[in-house]
Swiss-Prot record:
One GO-annotated biological process of the protein: cysteinyl-tRNA aminoacylation
PANTHER family tied to this protein: CYSTEINE--TRNA LIGASE, MITOCHONDRIAL-RELATED, CYSTEINYL-TRNA SYNTHETASE
Cofactor note as given: Binds 1 zinc ion per subunit.
Annotated residues for binding of L-cysteine: 82, 122, 285
CDD domains: CysRS_core
Annotated protein name in UniProt: Probable cysteine--tRNA ligase, mitochondrial
Cofactor(s) recorded in Swiss-Prot or TrEMBL: Zn(2+)
GO cellular component, one term: mitochondrion
Highest taxon listed in the record's lineage: Eukaryota
Reaction(s) the record says it catalyses: tRNA(Cys) + L-cysteine + ATP = L-cysteinyl-tRNA(Cys) + AMP + diphosphate; 2 L-cysteine = S-sulfanyl-L-cysteine + L-alanine; S-sulfanyl-L-cysteine + L-cysteine = S-disulfanyl-L-cysteine + L-alanine; S-sulfanyl-L-cysteine + tRNA(Cys) + ATP = (S)-sulfanyl-L-cysteinyl-tRNA(Cys) + AMP + diphosphate
Domain statement: 'KIIK' region and 'KMSKS' region are required for cysteine persulfide synthase activity.
């Protein structure tokens, strides 16, 4: 009996009643373990066989960090819940998609794991039908409009597109077939009203992986035709003037949960590596997806890892950002004030699974972080060019800090994609780099340490590129001929201003002799020249202020001047 119990626990396809009995304590049965993790009464999670990537992810199925094990060490299958396209995407949606985009980039660029990502577009839904009626347009026209709008928003936020988008309405035959198979397996039933429901009681305690606090005392409402209150719709009979499709159960349309199960299974089959979505989708949506897929495939572990992002909420409001609560900011409205890179840094400053508060203060923290990085890179490049004269650099210490940073960042990424820890490690490196970039008036005879600063610049730019961020200076690179021309115009303008400024400061009036009398004469002459040339110096200062209005930050460094392009949205 112990052998049979072990097979039942580890997922052998015994009849359900036998499996449930085997999972119950039995008199005289010895203890055993099959290496599975049981986070709830809904069943056990078994580590998949395959390649251990060295990454640990917080798995909502087990409620702990598990090693990410893939059948193919270079490819992960990934299903992402996509938008229901009835309105503009808001910042809460954007936060979730940007966070998962960051994870996808880390998997590829740090660990060499490509991702095959399928995202569903729900283009038929109660909300779509309701909104279409309000606007007096067809549900199809509404859905296509906001689907394109969503894709434009994601492009603006630099979110990589999925490998493939799949619309619900283009998969209706597959959905009907999927439902028929679940019915044939004994896990769903059709009603006389033309509805089809999943029979939750048919899978017993396996239901409740994300929420096991159910009451079995509730009975079905008299206004509905399902057997039990927990049963959920796979197919819904159509109402007058609603879109419908013909089916074995009459005219109707699919339920919400069955769409994702069908589309994910049609691409990935009976095994899925990673499933993602917002934490609000864990129950009931992802719970029901799992129930449907395991009923269809006759398996006990369809998806191996479920990753969920935390809510984004406005400062002073604990409720998640939501259209239904009318406490949201659209992506388009947000991008009038801040840039995509600034929002991405905002997302990086918190763990992906944590709730995050949005406010002007939290956004300006992200803006300041990017500015600190950009300023350091600009100063380090000026040092390499000989434009910034500094005291001798402790080169060995900086090499040590750089190597430690690389190790710490890799460790942070391996630990459930801990981006706040990774960013902190890079900011600590910048702190130590800045400490040694202190300008001095005269250059010493000591050799300059350009190479270590070049290596730091290269690593920091690579770090940002991995995460999907571009430094502002790099964004000036010739996207087209006009950008290149403007770049050269600014270069010439700053060079001319630098020459005028040096003349106004009488920087070339230093005497060759160094006697006491000559020094005194030089000081007096320079004082007179500074008074005479004061209007030129004021004009240089005014030019710097005017250029700052257009996002051009001029830095005067002794006898030389450099510039960087800042995002004007930083001033908002």
């Amino acid at each position: 009996m112990n052998a049979l119990m072990r097979r039942a626990c580890c997922g052998a396809l015994f009849p359900l009643s036998f499996r449930l009995a085997a999972l119950s304590p039995m008199k005289g049965a010895s203890n055993f373990s099959c290496g599975n993790v049981c986070a709830s009464p809904a069943g056990c999670w078994a580590p998949p066989s395959g390649h251990d990537t060295g990454i640990k992810v917080y798995n909502s199925l087990t409620r702990r960090k598990d090693p990410l094990i893939l059948a193919d060490p270079t490819v992960a299958t990934w299903y992402s819940c996509g938008p229901t396209v009835y309105d503009h995407a808001h910042l809460g949606h954007a936060c979730s998609y940007v966070r998962f985009d960051i994870i996808r980039r880390i998997l590829l660029k740090v660990f060499g794991i490509d991702t095959v990502v399928v995202m569903v577009v729900t283009d038929i839904d109660d909300k779509i039908i309701k909104r279409a009626k309000e606007l007096n347009i067809s549900p199809v026209a509404l859905a296509r409009t906001y689907e394109q709008d969503f894709k434009q928003d994601m492009t603006a936020l630099k979110v990589l597109p999925p490998t493939v988008y799949m619309r619900v309405t283009e998969n209706i035959p597959q959905i009907i077939s999927f439902i028929e198979h679940i019915i044939a397996n004994g896990y769903a039933y059709a009603t006389s009203q033309g509805n089809v429901y999943f029979d939750v009681q048919s899978i017993g305690e396996r239901y409740g992986k994300f929420n096991d606090s159910f009451s079995d005392t509730a009975s079905e409402s008299a206004s509905q035709d399902k057997r039990h209150i927990r049963d959920f719709a796979l197919w819904k009979t159509s109402k007058p003037e609603e879109p419908y499709w013909a089916s074995p159960w009459g005219k109707g349309r699919p339920g919400w949960h069955i769409e994702c199960s069908t589309i994910a299974s049609s691409v990935f089959g009976k095994h899925l590596d990673i499933h993602t979505g917002g934490i609000d989708l864990a129950f009931p949506h992802h719970e029901n997806e799992i129930a449907q897929c395991e009923a269809y495939h006759q398996s006990t572990q369809w998806g191996n890892y479920f990753l969920h992002t935390g809510h984004l909420h406005l400062k002073g409001n604990e409720e998640k950002m939501s259209k239904s609560l009318r406490n949201y900011l659209t992506v388009k409205e947000f991008l009038k004030s801040f840039s995509p890179d600034q929002f991405r840094m905002f997302c990086l400053r918190s763990k992906y699974k944590s709730a995050v508060e949005y406010s002007n203060g939290s956004m300006h923290d992200a803006v300041n972080t990017l500015h600190t990085i950009s300023s350091f890179v600009d100063d380090a490049k000026a040092y390499m060019k000989g434009q910034l004269i500094c005291q001798p650099v402790q080169e060995a210490l900086l090499w040590q800090r750089l190597n430690e940073t690389k190790v710490n960042v890799k460790a942070a990424f391996s630990d459930d994609f801990d981006t706040p820890r990774a960013v902190d490690a890079v900011m600590d490196l910048i702190h130590h780099g800045n400490r040694q970039l202190k300008a001095v008036s005269k250059e010493s005879n000591s050799p300059r340490s350009s190479v270590v600063y070049g290596a730091m610049i290269s690593y920091i730019e690579q770090f940002l590129e991995i995460l999907g961020i571009s430094l502002s200076q790099n964004q000036v690179a010739a996207e087209d001929r006009h950008s290149a021309v403007l770049f050269n115009v600014v270069e010439e303008m700053i060079s001319f201003r630098s020459k005028v400024r040096n003349y106004a400061l009488a920087a070339d009036e230093s005497p060759n002799a160094i006697g006491q009398e000559e020094k005194q004469q030089y000081k007096e002459r320079r004082r007179q020249l500074l008074l005479e040339r004061e209007p030129l110096l004021q004009a240089c200062d005014i030019m710097r202020q005017h250029l700052a209005v257009y996002g051009i930050n001029v830095k005067d460094r002794g006898n030389t001047s450099t510039w960087e392009l800042l995002d004007r949205k930083e001033e908002t």
